[in-house]
Every structure is written in C-alpha cells, then in structure tokens.
Amino acid sequence: DTLPRKHIVPYGLGDWCPPGGNETIDCPIALSSTAFHYFDVSIMEKVANLLKKTEDVYYFNSLKKSIYTAFVAEFYDMKNKTFGSQTADAMALDFGLVPKGDEGAVSKAIAKNMEEKYDNFLHIGIFGLGRIGEALSRYGNGKKAWELFTKTGENSFAYMWTDAEATTLR
C-alpha cells in the first residue's frame, strides 16, 4: 500500500473502449483503480484467512476498511446516490463499495444516467460491460436490464452481434 495516496490509486488505464473512444471515458481512472485495489485487498484477506494467518487477516481487513472509507469519501455523491457514471456505479455495486442500504438507489442512478445522458444506451467500457446487467437486475431494475440487452441500433448488443461482428460476444 505504498503506492496509493491516502488509499486512492490515482493512476491506471481506466474504463477502456466506451462509445466514442477512450477520450469519452466518464468513469474517473482513480475510481476504477481504487475499486480494483479494494477488490485485490479483499482477495488477500480471504487468502490470509484460508491460510490461518491471523495477523495478515487483521492487516488486510483494516486496509480494506480504510480503502472503503476513502473511496466513498472521494467518489460518492450522497445526495444523488451515485458515483457519477454507469461504470462507476456498476463497479461500486459489484465490489461492495456502496454504503449499506443505498444499493437500490445506486442501481436506479445507472438507469437514470442511461435515460438522461445517453438516450437509454450504455456508456461504458471494459470495466462496466460485464457488470452493468447484474447492477441493474440484482437491485430492482431488471426491466431496464432487459430493455438494454434487447435494444437494437448502434451502441447496442444487437449491433455488436449483427453489424460490428464483435468476436468478444461469440
């Protein structure tokens, strides 16, 4: 933990390949990097527990709590219940970085972002893509997830299959 600054990791590659290219990434690099840092520390805590390394369990648990606190303080808009973008909200939900009780509201913030900013389409890159469906459906927005996955037109899953011939979906 010598590289992060006050438990925030300020560098990384970010949420690559959103619609419009990497210059349109709207999930802050520090947010995605810090979320992965939290995830990695969570894994280390589990490994230490399996190995019965009590001191390491305590260390990683304490570090995880510090990262969580810093993450929420740095990135969470408590008033609007969002981390600011579809990917940011989906990652926070997936990694358990949303304040307890706010999960449904953060999921709704994803749907609201899609509706208000992106004409009901995704605006996510590689980190959001695998998380967006569960972030919507697990927390009461299954209808929005269904609409998203069955929508047609550019920047849709149907477009990736039929027109873009995206091999990653096959």
Where are these regions (language model features)?
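Active-site core of glycosidic bond-cleaving carbohydrate-active enzymes
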Residues: 1-170
